[in-house]
Amino acid sequence: MNEQDKLKKAVGEKAATMVKDGMKVGLGSGSTVYWMIRSLGERIQQDGLKIEGIPSSNQTATWAEEAGIPLTDFSNVKELDITIDGADEVDANNHLIKGGGAALFREKIIAQAAKEFVIIVDQSKVVETLGEFSLPVEVLPFSWQRTANEISKLGCVPTVRVHEEEPLVTDNGNYILDCPFKVIPHPDKLNKEIKSIVGVIETGLFIDMATTVIVGEKDNIYIK
């Protein structure tokens, strides 16, 4: 296991300790969340922890089932006690870019549904200003080229994310446009501008949503 994976494992295990008996838990996506799910599974097996989870992606659902975490959905749950997820960038104000794993729409739903939204990252994801990581935007496949052209007027050249030489299709049946803005000094303004474009489903900008950010750096875990 390399150093970055060790940090992901450490922050994932730390976040898992925040989950208490009886909680409804939003399960995010990505490699850091994998370790959190593993740790929750161990607590279920060893300590009899009783929780229910709502996954943000099909991959997360598979990991949760393998870990023995009972799953539910929003037909049975109105509110989540906690959602734990990773991020691609976290800025000085704890605004986020997410969506590198193409699950941003469902991730935002379970984040907004939770009383507490905990982000787990390694130090490499912490930045002063968002934008170095291309901003993912989920769009309808119908006329995605036109949607991309409208987004380009805001200051970037979007590209459709591909998988095996075809546009990647999200769990919701949509496409992802990766938008390299380079620097996003006013994420709230940009988020509103992009979401006003017809054809946009959701952006990977998570503004004022994270309640806690757990960061792993060499030999240390700190709360941001």
Swiss-Prot record:
Gene Ontology cellular component list: cytosol
GO biological process: D-ribose metabolic process; pentose-phosphate shunt, non-oxidative branch
Active site feature: E107 (proton acceptor)
Residues that, per the record, bind substrate: S29, G30, S31, T32, D85, G86, A87, D88, K98, G99, G100, G101, K125
CDD domains: RPI_A
Superkingdom, natural source: Bacteria
Pathway(s) of this molecule: Carbohydrate degradation; pentose phosphate pathway; D-ribose 5-phosphate from D-ribulose 5-phosphate (non-oxidative stage): step 1/1
NCBIfam families named among the record's database cross-references: PRK00702.1, rpiA
Similarity-based family: Belongs to the ribose 5-phosphate isomerase family.
Quaternary structure annotation from Swiss-Prot or TrEMBL: Homodimer.
Name of the protein in question: Ribose-5-phosphate isomerase A 1
Species annotation: Oceanobacillus iheyensis (strain DSM 14371 / CIP 107618 / JCM 11309 / KCTC 3954 / HTE831)
